[in-house]
């Protein structure tokens, strides 16, 4: 960790970095094309408004990875409540068809995964950068379904 990694607030020095993963309700694969671009733009905007720095991020079809630096004046749970609540409202505003897929405007799953980032910063950034490729490889390993009666597709 270098001195460049340390931030300051009035009389506080801090280096609070987190790897956060969260998914849409029912883990639906919704982040393709324009919805993928839209969620990226929305999350960048919301993070900027809160003073949160995005170090690395990836929108996979059925989940989001964020590697962020959150100031200590903001709790992770408070930030995630804000991020998921506002982003859901903004997605519903842009894409009216989502209302029919998700009841009661519950776009995101209730929970999320969070881990502190210590000395593994470069590894986590690399992991997030390669996450989309890993998901695609996993999907390619799926055996195509065949008819149980004829053996053909």
Identify the role of each PLM range.
Residues 1-153:
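Basic nucleic-acid-binding interfaces
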